[in-house]
């Protein structure tokens, strides 16, 4: 599969240790800053229709604001009930001060 890097946001727009919701080419994503690294997942919880960008980020775990299920934002792994399905992650790279995401 060919990579297709898309300019999502400026790096400074993602608060340190927090999450930012963005729409990239019509797709809702959540971008996370964890210990100096940026990670990207789908913005909707796999359990309910809650936006992950409205959740609480602690370390590398995001807590869904609706039912308090948690995901590892680095791997997408579902960590506790009621979530059982992993959340999709996307490759991220930084070019200059821009956050680039591969949606392919």
Swiss-Prot record:
Pathway: Aromatic compound metabolism; naphthalene degradation. Disulfide bonds: none annotated. [2Fe-2S] cluster binds at residues 45, 47, 64, 67. CDD domains: Rieske_RO_ferredoxin. GO terms for biological process: catabolic process. Belongs to the bacterial ring-hydroxylating dioxygenase ferredoxin component family. This is Naphthalene 1,2-dioxygenase system, ferredoxin component. It comes from Pseudomonas aeruginosa.
